[in-house]
């Protein structure tokens, strides 16, 4: 078979396979052209998922008749004034989009510069160009794409449903709208309600407002500002609370010099920054903007221009990880507002239960027939009214009696305190002004109820203490290692032979965390020392859990990350368990320590440690609002 030159139309169709693989790609290229033309208002219409029609209208600089003819030729562009590809400041630069779209669709472009007496329109159908002719247009440019891929029908078989393609196109517009808050956008898809985003300023306040416009008010309430700079690279933006996360990465918006990207290096940095805060299957919501010298980043590495290559990728990664880590650690303890909203919603829309026989439903009488005793009811147990609880053992009896008396004292409103322990049950009024308030009660020996000036806080005692222990282990690692405590009698832990071998290989890593082990025959290890923070933990269960999680370690994972994985497992064993009764002083001490600890709003697995309900939320529960 001899070599031959391909005809221009076929060349354009081949190129279109890289540049325009789906309707969303065409929308991206056309909106980027509008932004590069200086438009401040852009309108996007998508019909039939983009297969039937895509129309982009803008108020940019416009093109003359001669420029229209050049615009539909391959590699003709106004965006490269020189031959330097390392100083690109525009979104587009190759001059491939319009001829590629025209090769596989019916394309029409009407444009009018501000100084021109009227507009001109050019048409391209399947690669065949019709010369420009006069047209009616007030100003700017209008690009209309109909019957996308009619010239390459095989491509249509690979498209998804109209709804899915329209959603992909909308995502493209959202990303570009976030990149340029100073541009007003209107998005229309079929019969859906148009989305309009007004122009904002390009400063941090304008970016935050545009993020709230595009992602919704709920996202705006659950994002915190981040600002950082390192080695000539500046980072600004908004990062989501760990408790406000998604099941996919579609809500992660990254921009480099105003260009939306989905770069592997940047995505890896995000995972590292949130590794202690989110489980592996959850993704933070964020919008981050990197600015650097165009010569320090190569944007010409992917046909769709969605990937970039940094000259100093390590510097960029370090900036992202450090800035996000510091911002998340420095925040006042808080949880996603959506948690309280969902709680209110669930409380006000109870699930339907299967109907029960009428005889099984006791009659509810809100008022008693007999009068209330003058001294009020005695809430304490008596032989006539025994409490339906298990008898405490001797070790806990004194503590439980003290707790019961403290609770009884809190019920005796207006009565003098019986002793000093009753006074301890009522926290200082000043605690109400603290972020997590003053402890008032414990529910099911698992949850702490605290009161604040503005409402109430519900704390998961195990999750909260797990985070506190984990942060202490991390701090000890960063200093001079975790303090150890020797066992009076070394513990022998039986394991699967493979697990025992893995732990033996990691003995050095574990020693840095205070867990000193050594091989003890086949399928067993001998534990000589444990971290001092975990002195009361079940050694056998601790070692078995560490062995189980060690199977998930990747040898390529840095030592620091492996140690933190072990620390997270240890923290779970060293924390207050659900089912343990706490005194009021212990509950308040836990709250105060949470206020001083970084990332106290979520446990090591990404679950919230507490939720806050404002008085307004509580009033909603009782339909008072």
Curated annotation (Swiss-Prot):
InterPro entries: DNA_mismatch_repair_CS (IPR014762), DNA_mismatch_repair_MutL (IPR020667), DNA_mismatch_S5_2-like (IPR013507), HATPase_C_sf (IPR036890), MutL/Mlh/PMS (IPR002099), MutL/Mlh/Pms-like (IPR038973), MutL_C (IPR014790), MutL_C_dimsub (IPR042120)
The UniProt record lists the keyword S-adenosyl-L-methionine: no
SMART domains recorded: DNA_mis_repair, MutL_C
Pfam family, one: MutL_C
SUPFAM superfamilies: ATPase domain of HSP90 chaperone/DNA topoisomerase II/histidine kinase, DNA mismatch repair protein MutL, Ribosomal protein S5 domain 2-like
A cellular component annotation (GO) from this entry: mismatch repair complex
PROSITE patterns, alphabetized: DNA_MISMATCH_REPAIR_1
CDD domains given in the database record: HATPase_MutL-MLH-PMS-like, MutL_Trans
GO annotation terms (biological process): mismatch repair
Entry superkingdom: Bacteria
Keywords noted in UniProt: DNA damage, DNA repair
Any one GO MF annotation of this record: ATP binding
Cross-referenced NCBIfam families: mutl, PRK00095.2-4
Role played: This protein is involved in the repair of mismatches in DNA. It is required for dam-dependent methyl-directed DNA mismatch repair. May act as a 'molecular matchmaker', a protein that promotes the formation of a stable complex between two or more DNA-binding proteins in an ATP-dependent manner without itself being part of a final effector complex.
UniProt family annotation: Belongs to the DNA mismatch repair MutL/HexB family.
The protein's name: DNA mismatch repair protein MutL
Taxonomic lineage of the native organism: Bacteria, Pseudomonadati, Pseudomonadota, Alphaproteobacteria, Hyphomicrobiales
């Amino acid at each position: 078979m001899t070599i031959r030159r391909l005809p221009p139309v076929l060349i354009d169709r081949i190129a279109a396979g890289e540049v325009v693989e789906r309707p969303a790609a065409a929308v991206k290229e056309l909106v980027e052209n509008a932004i590069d033309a200086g438009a401040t208002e852009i309108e996007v219409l998508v019909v039939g998922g983009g297969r039937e029609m895509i129309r982009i209208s803008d108020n940019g600089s416009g093109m003359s008749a001669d420029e229209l003819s050049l615009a539909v030729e391959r590699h003709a562009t106004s965006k490269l004034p020189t031959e330097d590809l390392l100083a690109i400041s525009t979104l587009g630069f190759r001059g491939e989009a319009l001829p590629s779209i025209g090769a596989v669709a019916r394309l029409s472009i009407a444009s009018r510069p501000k100084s021109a007496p009227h507009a001109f329109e050019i048409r391209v159908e399947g690669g065949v160009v019709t010369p420009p002719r006069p047209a009616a247009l007030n100003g700017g440019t209008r690009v209309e794409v109909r019957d996308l891929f009619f010239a390459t029908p095989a491509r249509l078989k690979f498209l998804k449903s109209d709804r899915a393609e329209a959603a992909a196109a909308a995502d493209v517009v959202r990303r570009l709208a976030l990149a340029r808050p100073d541009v007003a956008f209107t998005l229309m898809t079929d019969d859906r309600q148009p989305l309009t985003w007004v122009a904002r300023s390009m400063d941090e306040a304008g970016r935050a407002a545009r993020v709230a416009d595009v992602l919704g008010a709920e996202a705006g309430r659950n994002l915190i500002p981040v600002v950082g700079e390192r080695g000539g690279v500046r980072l600004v933006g908004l990062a989501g609370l760990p408790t406000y996360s998604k099941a996919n990465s579609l809500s992660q918006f990254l921009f480099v010099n105003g260009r939306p990207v989905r770069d592997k290096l940047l995505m890896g940095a995000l995972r590292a920054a949130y590794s202690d805060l989110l489980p592996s299957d959850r993704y933070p919501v964020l919008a981050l903007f990197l600015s650097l010298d165009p010569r320090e980043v190569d944007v010409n590495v992917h046909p769709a221009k969605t990937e970039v290559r940094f000259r100093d990728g390590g510097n960029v990664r370090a900036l992202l990880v450090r800035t996000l880590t510091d911002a998340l650690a420095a925040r006042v303890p808080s949880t996603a507002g959506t948690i309280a909203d969902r709680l209110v919603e669930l409380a006000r829309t109870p699930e339907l239960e299967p109907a029960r026989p009428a005889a099984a439903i006791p009659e509810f009488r809100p008022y008693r027939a007999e009068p209330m005793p003058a001294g009020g009811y005695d809430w304490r147990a008596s032989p006539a009214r025994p409490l339906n609880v298990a008898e405490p053992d001797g070790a806990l009896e004194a503590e439980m009696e003290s707790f019961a008396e403290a609770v009884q004292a809190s019920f005796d409103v207006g009565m003098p305190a019986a002793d000093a322990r009753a006074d301890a049950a009522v926290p200082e009024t000043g605690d109400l002004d603290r972020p997590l308030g003053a402890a008032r009660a414990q529910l099911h020996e698992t949850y702490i109820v605290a009161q604040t000036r503005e409402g109430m806080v519900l704390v998961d005692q195990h999750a909260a203490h797990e985070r506190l222990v984990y942060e202490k282990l991390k701090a000890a690692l960063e200093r001079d290692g975790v303090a150890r405590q020797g066992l009076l009698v070394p513990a022998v832990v039986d394991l699967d032979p493979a697990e025992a071998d893995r732990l033996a290989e990691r003995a050095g890593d574990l020693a840095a965390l205070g867990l000193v082990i050594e091989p003890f025959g086949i399928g067993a290890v001998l534990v000589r020392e444990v971290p001092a923070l975990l002195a009361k933990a079940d050694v056998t269960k601790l070692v078995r859990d560490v062995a189980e999680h060690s199977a998930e370690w990747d040898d390529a994972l840095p030592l620091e990350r492996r140690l933190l994985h072990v620390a997270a497992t240890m923290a779970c064993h060293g924390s207050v368990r659900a089912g343990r009764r706490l005194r009021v002083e212990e509950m308040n001490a836990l709250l105060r320590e949470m206020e001083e600890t970084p990332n106290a709003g979520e446990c090591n697995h990404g679950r919230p440690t507490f939720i806050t309900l404002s008085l307004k939320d509580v009033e909603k529960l009782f339909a008072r609002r």
